[in-house]
């Protein structure tokens, strides 16, 4: 991921090209992308910029800053820039906000505005969803994945020949304010699922130290598991 990094050296760009052509996945962002990464992103700059909204789920989120208008040269549109919160029936004239381009065995997702800077400053859930949709469009192979609320974090570790999937629930209930930061209660995150690539079928899987409900199966090199609850911290032990 190269977020809003302008004037990257040509030597580094050539390494990026080789990385993607060999099967790598890349996300670049910023209004400069069409001009500075055009060949890699499959676009060229058009005249003018656009401001407005980005489609996110069944709604839209306001995007701050300008999005560069582009001409598609092999890339396809992932998200358009909307003039308001509704997607028009005829979207032929919409400005691409994000695009996807296949390069060799890999692919490049480009976001043509300052979305990472916007998210850093505001943390709007809609922007997080757009970024997640762009990342998912890359279809990166070999990744472990969670289907869980955004506040559930997973970290994988190896110890004594076992794989340990740590889960942390970062949610909080009750009111928060600029002068009251106490967390009085962490609500259960509820049921969620994960997928972890594993070459061989595990002998055993269990949750520890909290033995919550667990259903798992292995197929075609992927371990899939449904976990019934997560309070604050728990571990899926894979043997």
Where are these regions (language model features)?
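A conserved amphipathic helix/loop scaffold
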Residues: 3-239
């Amino acid at each position: 991921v190269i977020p809003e990094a302008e004037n990257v050296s040509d030597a580094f760009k050539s390494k990026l090209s080789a990385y993607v052509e060999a099967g790598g996945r890349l996300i670049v962002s910023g209004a400069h992308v069409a001009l500075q990464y055009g060949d890699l992103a499959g676009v060229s700059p058009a005249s003018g910029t656009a401001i407005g909204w980005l489609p996110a789920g069944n709604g839209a989120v306001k995007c701050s800053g300008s999005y560069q208008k582009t001409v598609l040269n092999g890339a396809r549109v992932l998200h358009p820039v909307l003039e308001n919160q509704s997607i028009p029936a005829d979207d032929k004239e919409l400005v691409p906000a994000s695009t996807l381009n296949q390069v060799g065995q890999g692919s490049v997702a480009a976001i043509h505005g300052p979305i990472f800077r916007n998210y850093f400053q505001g943390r709007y859930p809609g922007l997080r969803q757009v970024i997640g949709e762009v990342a998912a469009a890359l279809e990166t192979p070999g990744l472990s994945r969670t289907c869980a609320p955004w506040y559930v974090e997973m970290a994988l570790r190896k110890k004594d020949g076992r794989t340990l999937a740590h889960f942390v629930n970062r949610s909080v209930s009750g009111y928060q304010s600029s002068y009251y930061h106490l967390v009085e209660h962490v609500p259960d995150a509820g049921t969620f699922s994960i997928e972890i690539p594993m070459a061989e079928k595990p002998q055993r899987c269990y949750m520890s130290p909290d033995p919550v409900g667990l259903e798992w199966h292995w197929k075609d090199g992927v371990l899939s598991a449904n976990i019934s609850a997560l309070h604050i911290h728990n571990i899926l032990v894979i043997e």
